[in-house]
């Protein structure tokens, strides 16, 4: 009897242990199954694995840069020593010749003067009075002038058009004084703006472009400058004006009638199939003849900068050639130059 009870006890203990083992195994299985069922990328307090981690390396496509054609390298197509052609609408470079080599910009400098003037917030009817002390240095150096006289009071608007249409050094000197108090301070302002625009091979020492060893730029930088200038409606209005009459003064009772030098120069060189808009000429003995201009075709604006021409007509002829070469010219982003 006792032996039978002992056997039953052993069997019961064995069954109990087996049941416990089965329960523990089932629990382990369920936990493992739940872990397997967790979707990839679920937030578990760590970094979710990427789907690409499970893809063999050779099957993951490598990122590729889009092919960007180099700009057309100009040579005998033009006579000027420097050139840069840009699509102003998207900043793509179409063609260039020594575009990043330093040269003297002459009166193309006045584009920066115009830009800073238009950004100054000075009202167009703000008056300015000339004196002989500021005019004498310009006369001595043979700078181009509007013709304003000692004691003559004109407006800020008169100075804007006077600096561009006839390329008046008297107008740019006056703008520098109105904006920054004196021309040297204004030149520093010009240089800060140049750096901000990415004109890293440019340095200005005056507002008009009179020759100085430390007054230089590149065709590329001038193209960047003109591109920025065209973003301002007032700048564009001044650059495209064919004629302007200054305020009536006691020195000039009927005002001074100013005509666009660019329009006069380009009259015999207007390109086909594109509408020439305007720009800025330049000349010194060191710079040669220069022209920064822009034209439009089907809503797209193109910029052509040419410099270092030997004759007055040279940059105009080259600009005509380049505008007519625009169709089919490969493009490259100006920021990658």
Describe the residue ranges of each PLM region:
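Hydrophobic membrane-insertion alpha-helices, especially the h-region
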Residues: 15-28
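Active-site-adjacent loops and short helices of periplasmic peptidoglycan-processing enzymes
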Residues: 37-220, 229-230, 297
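Catalytic-site microenvironment of enzymes
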Residues: 10-11, 16, 87, 94, ...
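Penicillin-recognizing serine hydrolase domain
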Residues: 13, 34, 39-45, 68-82, ...
């Amino acid at each position: 009897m006792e032996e039978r009870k002992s056997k039953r006890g052993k069997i019961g203990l064995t069954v109990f242990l087996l049941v416990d083992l089965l329960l523990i195994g089932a629990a382990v299985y369920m936990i493992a199954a739940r872990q397997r069922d967790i979707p990839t990328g679920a937030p578990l307090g760590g970094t979710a694995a990427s789907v690409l981690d499970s893809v063999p390396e050779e099957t993951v496509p490598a990122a590729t840069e889009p092919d960007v054609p180099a700009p057309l390298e100009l040579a005998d197509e033009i006579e000027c020593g420097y050139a840069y052609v840009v699509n102003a609408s998207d900043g793509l470079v179409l063609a260039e010749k020594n575009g990043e080599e330093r040269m003297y910009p002459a009166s193309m400098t006045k584009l920066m003067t115009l830009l800073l003037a238009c950004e100054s917030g000075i009202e167009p009817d703000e008056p300015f009075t000339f004196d002989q002390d500021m005019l004498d240095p310009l006369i001595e150096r043979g700078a181009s002038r509007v013709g304003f006289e000692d004691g003559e009071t004109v407006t800020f608007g008169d100075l804007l058009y006077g600096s561009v249409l006839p390329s008046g050094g008297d107008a740019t000197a006056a703008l520098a004084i109105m904006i920054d108090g004196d021309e040297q301070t204004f030149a520093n302002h010009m240089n800060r703006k140049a750096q901000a625009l990415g004109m890293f091979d440019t340095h200005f020492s005056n507002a008009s472009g009179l020759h100085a060893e430390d007054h230089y730029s590149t065709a590329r930088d001038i193209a960047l400058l003109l591109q920025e200038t065209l973003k301002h409606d007032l700048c564009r209005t001044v650059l495209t004006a064919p004629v302007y009459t200054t305020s009536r003064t006691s020195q000039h009772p009927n005002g001074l009638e100013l005509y666009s030098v660019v329009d006069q120069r380009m009259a015999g060189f207007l390109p086909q199939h594109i509408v020439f808009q305007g720009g800025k000429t330049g000349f010194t003995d060191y710079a040669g003849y220069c022209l920064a201009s822009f034209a439009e075709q089907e809503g797209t604006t193109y910029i052509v900068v040419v410099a270092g021409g030997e004759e007055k007509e040279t940059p105009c002829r080259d600009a005509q050639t380049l505008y007519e070469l625009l169709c089919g010219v490969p493009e490259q982003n100006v920021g990658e130059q």
